[in-house]
Amino acid sequence: PLSRAVVRSGSGDIHLVEVGDLEAVTGSGDVRVTTVGRGRAQTGSGDIWAGAVRDSLVTRTGSGDVTVASTGRLQSTSGSGDITVDELHGQARLRTASGDAHVARAVSGHLDVKSTSGDVRVGVAQGTAVLLDCSTVSGQMRSALRSTGEPEPGEETLELVARTISGNLLVDRAG
């Protein structure tokens, strides 16, 4: 494993297996890292994929998609690309202009999602209590979660803040 990697590329892809601290910048290439401690990844039009994020990751793309398998802390911004998080245990701040944002399984923490015209979908893990603060101006909003009152002591809790202008919002239990 590398303790630190600083990589810049105009159009080539960046592929790393395991790195402690990462700084990766490409114009049109993709960034792919299997395991990262802390990192920053930026692309103009390339995609970003991260497997396990042990500490935190900050991503920014113009038109590329961002996919993160598992994370504790994530800050991700995309102009027209989609942002996908498979599993969240911690804090995430997701921003898209026209891309969709999807969190497949949110277990605990604080999730703040904003999209102008993209859709927002969040799957909440079974057994996780949720505090919802969601709104859309002209999109449709749907939550399949039941109201259960205050969380039990020791129960996993997720605070979800989600906003769209014209995108749809869907909150459901993770499959």
What are these regions (language model features)?
Residues 1-175:
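Intrinsically disordered, low-complexity terminal regions
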